[in-house]
Amino acid sequence: MFNLPEPKDDGLLIPEVGEWSKDKHYFLLRYIDAFTNSMKKKKWSGLHYIDLFAGAGIERLKESGKLEWGSPLIAAHCSHFDGLHLCELNNKKFTTLNERVKKICDKAQIFNGDANEKVFDIVKQIPERSLSLAFLDPYGLHLDYETLKVLAQKRADLVIFFPDHLD
């Protein structure tokens, strides 16, 4: 398992999230570890990470005030991925994410716009015979079925977080 350094307040945007986010990222980290370690030696020409609702990259837990890595920076710390393909609709979060990712990883492409539209551009960037892990954590229910179909046609494991409530 790869170790993550503690996130630091870099003066950029840090959205607040509920404490549940800590558990979500704990399980994502374990899935990334299992996925990359089991698939890196297989017949794939590359391993890619897709995050269509990427956020700003660092989050502050509302109750404790503790900083946590967001999903795209968890993946950016994993050296086994040959490419990261990230999308964020919110302009401020996109700009912040772009700055943070570039400090950690030079294999990322970051798209600004609606994930359900940008998914077509994203899958074009992934080479044939590659395997992808797509983490989908939509804000509310902003995930189209067509988006799932596009990703599934590209040899991708889909990890989808559907919140049962929003805070």
Task: Indicate where each model-derived feature is located.
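Class I S-adenosyl-L-methionine
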Residues: 119-133, 139-167
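N-terminal start-of-chain detector that recognizes signal peptides
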Residues: 20, 58, 107, 130-133
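Short, charged/polar micro-motifs that form catalytic or ligand-binding hotspots
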Residues: 14-18, 87, 137-138
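SAM cofactor-binding core of SAM-dependent methyltransferases
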Residues: 24-121
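Basic, amphipathic N-terminal segments that precede the first structured/catalytic domain
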Residues: 1-24
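Small/polar loops that bind or transfer phosphate-bearing groups
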Residues: 111, 135-136
